[in-house]
Structure formats: C-alpha cells, structure tokens
C-alpha cells in the first residue's frame, strides 16, 4: 500500500511540474498592435515560446485576406525581411485550410513586425508591430 501511495505521489508531482512549466512558458507572451493595411486590418498576432520554439499565432478575429497567396513575413529590428509560410494551405479533397500559426526559424534574431504579404502580386497587405523587438 505504501508503494502505491509513493507511485501516486511521484506521478502527481510530475504532473504538477509539467503543468507549471507549460503555464510559465505561456506567460511569456507578446501581443502586437492590430494589423493595419489595405487587406489585412483585423486581429493581432501573439508571440510565445513552446518546447523551445518561437511561435507566432494570429488572433481569432484575424481574417486571412482573400488574395491568391497571402504569406507570413517577419521584419527584424534592422529592417531585414524574412518570408515564412503561406497562410493558405491545400487541404484534403481540394479544400483550403488556414495556417494561423507559424514557427519562427532560429536564424531570425528578433521580431519587430509581422506582415501579411501577397507573394503572387508582391504587395504588402498589412502589418502589425510589437511595442519593442522580441528576442
């Protein structure tokens, strides 16, 4: 009986540590200003770290522009622009899905702005800024 209690105690402590760790990781979030632009002008973007990876995620009220190739772009504090993934991805049976979250590659040292860019027309659709660059 004592052994079972010890096992349950160990599992409870481990579960608590995992919960606290994931909660602490989510506490370190950064929210941008609202998107401003001709086609992308709703919602915000949030930056957070998850499992050691830098993640950007648009808010629920963000509407992906109805353009041929809306794409995630990141601008760093030096003004360098990095093109990431497309917002629209092909789903099953010809349907389209939205990529509302993207991993930021480790070679990007900081994030000052997030842009929505039409890769087909090569035009900026909107952008959102952080109050200070995120490292």
Enumerate the language-model features and the residues they cover:
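Beta-strand signatures of extracellular beta-sandwich domains
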Residues: 71-75
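Transition segment at domain starts
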Residues: 23-52, 87-88, 135
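Bacterial N-terminal signal peptides
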Residues: 10-19
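Solvent-exposed strand-loop boundary residues in beta-sheet-rich modules
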Residues: 76-80, 120, 134
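Bacterial N-terminal signal peptides that target proteins for export
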Residues: 2-11
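Short amphipathic, basic-aromatic surface patches that mediate peripheral association
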Residues: 56-62
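Short, exposed beta-strand-loop hairpins at the edges of beta-sheets
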Residues: 103-129
